[in-house]
Amino acid sequence: IARDSQAARDAVAEATSEGAWTNRPVQEKAPHGSKINAFFEGGRVMNLRNKKGDGLIYAIRAGDIDDKALMSAVTVEELADFFLYAKAINERACSAISKKTGTLATVTTVNDLAGVDLLGDASFRNALSAASKRGDAYFPGLSGPTVLLNLPRLLGALVKLFTPLFPESVRAKLRFDRFPLGDAGALSTESG
């Protein structure tokens, strides 16, 4: 994690060096970014400030990502490293927001599952899960709620059945809803 944290520090410093955020340095310094970045273009993975400006939204449109092609280009560990780096970037951004606002800034993670093939290869989900577990250990105060949008019907029924069995600390951070996000611009900063 030290390597990812240092890379994140360097990337954020470069991304903000001219007084406004420039994403290119963050993407260029991402571990395995040369193999991964193209799969996340076009609004498939986005970081946004929330409406209040006191936290971040990290949105993943999983159904729009060609996970089979992505996972043929990288290993689960490489993708997990990439996602962990993204968490380190979010930690740096939340730290700056916290200093500015005087309150703890967190990241709300939004997973849009529209179009996700639950019966396909689990490698992509395994990489997300590995990065999430490591990220929660390295950045314990960073995670805010997790919003799962557009769950496939069967999964939605199972989640409703098993959610009461989750610990209260987990249930407090989960949100489920059906919401058509439309095109990638639906989560742009112009739309709020």
Question: What feature does the model see in each segment?
Answer:
Residues 1-192:
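Basic, amphipathic alpha-helical/coil surface patches used to engage anionic, phosphate-bearing ligands
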